[in-house]
UniProtKB/Swiss-Prot annotation:
Gene3D superfamilies: Transcriptional regulatory protein pf0864 domain like. It comes from Synechocystis sp. (strain ATCC 27184 / PCC 6803 / Kazusa). Belongs to the LarC family. It holds the Pfam family Ni_insertion. It comes from the Bacteria. The keyword Nucleus does not apply. This is Putative nickel insertion protein.
Amino acid sequence: MGLIAYFDCPTGISGDMCLGALVSAGVPLEYLMEKLAPLGLTDEYRLTAGLVQKQGQAATKVEVKLLNDHHSHGPGHHGMRHLPEIEQLIKQANLPARVSRWSLAIFHQLAIAEGEVHGIEPEAVHFHEVGATDAIVDIVGTCLGLDYLGIDQCYWSALPTGSGTVRAAHGDLPVPVPAVLKLWQTRQVPVYDNGLTGELVTPTGAAIAVTLASQFGPKPPLNLHKVGLGAGSKDFPLANILRLWIGTEITPHNHPLSSEAPFGQLETITVLETQLDDIQPQAVGYLLESLLHQGAIDVFTQAIAMKKSRPGILLTVLCAPENQNHCLNLLFRETTSLGVRVRQQQRYALEREWQTVVIPHGPIRIKVAYGYQAGKKIILNAHPEFADCAALAKATGQPWQLIHQQAIGAWSNLNKELSPES
């Protein structure tokens, strides 16, 4: 079973904090140096790691020490590489396949954000935030560390905004800097003010999180194997440490109370809600079909009484987090709603599959749902597909109810573990 990683970022995130947490979690510094060497940058930096104290807590501080002050050189120097040059370095470095894929994706996201801020194409971005040697080492090194530990999925906490200003290549910028805001916007990252002043999330850290995160928010259920602690450079009243939680996801297969575990798999869904009192009734059916076509898991309406005693409907949309924006935009485009409530909820969903049975009148698909009890897979229910039964009833002139009963009987004969009545 693959591992999942949760990046707990109470004081923010930067590339060197990611590296520190990964080294703390067991990634050898020598491994990173060996795998980074084919990038051809070893004459530009030195990679070091050591324990430091942050508010009385020990954490690993990884530093990318630049040699000969590479940041001080002009645009023609390697510290100001363009995106295509960085992509070429990564592609030629013989990195593990997913390390290369992750690294390229992170740099592409970062270049898009920086390009939008400056009004240029991503390929034309050449300022130090993307091209600096330390950014390359931070990003590729983080991907190498995740691959070394066998991480399959990454999750991130909500991120703190910070405040104040920071000195950048183009002068003083407000915190969060524009590129970080652009990156957050692409994933609608949950952010909050933790009261700390300064830059807490760097463009490199934001790009890593936005690109690799399966989800932002609370910790997923996991069996915790180890914790890595990565120290930041600044000192705050709160320990400036990124905490990397590594473990296996809790499923019905490995639940610590397997005999009492829920049958279903825990997953996160997005719930969209809006009240409507002026939509044409004919448009409601079209809207529901459009939302399902757009990727909604389910859509339903409830009759409600609104202000001024007007009758209306409460429209609820369930969708996967990655389909949230598609469904949200469709709601605004196809209704008169001026606001939609959004929340994340967890649900237990049964594993399911399609089986086909053949009755005297033709084939019928059966949706079969499974659960796990004490580590054993069991069938919980099975239902003939309504559309198949309806189509066969129309084609043969037989009652729909007869077709449905015959399908259940045929499936039950093939699967003695569950009787039709149970």
